Amino acid sequence: EKATVKGKQTDLSFELKRHEGKWMLPLRPILLGGDDLTFVCDGRIALDLAETALAVFEGSDVPHLGKITACAGVAITRVHAPFTRAYELAGKLCDNAKALVKQKDISSCALDWHIGLSRPGEAVTSIRERQYQVNPYTLTCRPYRLSSENDDELSWRWLSKTLLDDPEVGLRGKKWSTRRNKVKAFAELVREGPGGVKAALEAWNVTAKEWNVAKELCLPEPIAENGFHEKHTPLLDALELLDLHLVLESDGQGQGGNEKP
């Protein structure tokens, strides 16, 4: 079956196949031992495959242990980037996700990612301070917990399914996808803080009313008002993944129906 993105065909240069009823995932395992799993894959599906792997742990019920959790670090680099540095970065990102779970004292899987290589020896916290800190605001919400049964807001699944792909409020949804220049504008607006984002949203919608455009531009809760939750914003995280994060789904034409691998 073809790889699809939310029902649309996309050229990933490979097809998803099934063997004896099981999906053959397009990845190459590098390390399978102990409690660690490392694999290499097309960067555009890396986060989706990481979520799929974490979901297995999320749904686990081990005798005498109960529910177990796991964390993932995803380093998205160029094809010819030094593997050792990418591997080390992925490990640091995984540790950062683990720190979130420990700090928040939550029973949830979590993941973190970075696009490109870091400086040699640079900690993830230093990367975030250098690239995403505009005092008093933090322009990222990474790492993300996968989600929880009672609270999906500001989780990875919220970012992927709502902030990116919700038809009404998602940045890749029906309303925002035809206003790509405005979506890209968030990259600079967030540096002005909540006030800058709020003012832009209001101005865009006033203009839309003047042109008799019925579709009001809005963001999902809990960032609907100004793009921020407290002093953090997930908008830059979403913008970085706008053209890079693909969700694999069945096209429904072959064996497996609408199953997701």
Question: What does each model-identified segment do?
Answer:
Residues 1-261:
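Charged, helix-rich terminal subdomains or tails
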